[in-house]
Amino acid sequence: MISRIDLRGDALPEGPALRDLLPRADFDVSVALEKVRPICEAVHHRGDAALIDFTEQFDGVRLERVRVPAEELTRALEGLDPEVRAALEESIRRARLVHREQRRATHTTQVVPGGSVTEKWVPVERVGLYVPGGRSVYPSSVVMNVVPAQEAGVGSIALASPAQAEFGGIPHPTILAACALLGVDEVYAAGGATAVAMFAYGTESCPPANMVTGPGNIWVAAAKRFFTGKIGIDAEAGPTEIAVLADSTADPVHVASDLISQAEHDPLAAAVLVTDSAELADAVEKELQPQVEATKHIEDRIRPALAGRQSAIVLVDGLDEGLRVVDAYGAEHLEIQTADAAAVADRVKNAGAIFVGPWAPVSLGDYAAGSNHVLPTGGCACHSSGLSVQSFLRGIHIVDYTRDALAEVARHVVTLAEAEDLPAHGAAIKARFEWKVPESK
């Protein structure tokens, strides 16, 4: 059901050579990019009409309008199962606790007497948040996108999720109910690349956004790449992935269930166990089969995900080697199920989020840990972070110098300008001192 990669016995290679030994899904955004280009251009030129046509083509329903009426959000909240509502409210409460602490304060550094640099943080003015709606329904992604944007102080928040033919062309009612709980009333029935293009270009119904965030499939990732440099994006999110670093103290039942929990997202989802215990590897592999048979989404998601080239049990000589492997892999979700798990977690350099010990499974983070589940995938955790309040903030430096403070450093500025053959830079300093630049101290 799941392959093995044995890295024991030989010294592990460095850098790219080690990454090449590790399992990864085929996820070529460049191929999808050429297919989304005409979709994005059509939305640019035809606006809502293109959105309506593409929704009929891809989602099988003809819309009368793209924006969801406010009464649909009210109706969805009124019809929400009380237990689901309570769970969403608790998820929102915990997410707010964590994300509120991420706010950044204005800070001033006095460089010299009379010369200061202040860094202030300003929220993006308008964001477009995307919540997928293909294989599953993700009200939790509404929470994970909206809460950090709100806590950052974003003034205008719009959200898009695919139209559902089953519900007459509106997004899934649970998505709408989550929006209502969070006070988001600008919601659009738009999915995939069309939603990203709508936010990027704007249409008759939807003003353009400064930034687009949220998870999605390869078409969403391709559209984000298409608009890189034109609008802000969070990341090109690919298929979800879990890596578990475990030793002989780990419970194979827990490990197997956690691997399966992420495999049920998508047939391209990655599930990777890294361990120095052959006995644990055997026990986990034995445990996978009965757990898979006892759940849903077996043939269309879980089995192909576990059997795919992106999933494996990786055997290593010891914990140090295991840490090197998980750092090279850079998992979206990394569980540490070892002795002294907190100390081991502290040694990890590359992961979207780390889940410490047997009582912090990835599922907790997906819904109600307080952390964010919009995380870098495909090894991007080596250089990128998950969605947070900072994602929606821009740092602006405010430079404030008096005449004396400028005079003190003027000679250095002119010298560097001349060294770079940019005499007008130096002239801008000289002009303030009647072409007589005082000696820098």
Swiss-Prot record:
Signal peptide: none
Co-factor binding details: Binds 1 zinc ion per subunit.
BP-aspect Gene Ontology terms: L-histidine biosynthetic process
Binding site for Zn(2+): Q262, H265, D366, H425
Enzyme Commission number(s): 1.1.1.23
Annotated catalytic residues: E332 (proton acceptor), H333 (proton acceptor)
Alphabetized UniProt keyword annotations: Amino-acid biosynthesis, Histidine biosynthesis, Metal-binding, NAD, Oxidoreductase, Zinc
Name of a matching Pfam family: Histidinol_dh
TM segment ranges: none
Residues the entry annotates as binding substrate: T240, Q262, H265, H333, D366, E420, H425
Record's keyword annotation contains Repressor: no
Gene Ontology CC: one annotated term: cytosol
Pathway: Amino-acid biosynthesis; L-histidine biosynthesis; L-histidine from 5-phospho-alpha-D-ribose 1-diphosphate: step 9/9
GO molecular function: histidinol dehydrogenase activity; NAD binding; zinc ion binding
Top-tier EC class: oxidoreductase
Cofactor dependence: Zn(2+)
Catalysis: reaction(s): L-histidinol + 2 NAD(+) + H2O = L-histidine + 2 NADH + 3 H(+)
Job of this protein: Catalyzes the sequential NAD-dependent oxidations of L-histidinol to L-histidinaldehyde and then to L-histidine.
Family membership noted in the UniProt record: Belongs to the histidinol dehydrogenase family.
Protein's name according to its UniProt entry: Histidinol dehydrogenase
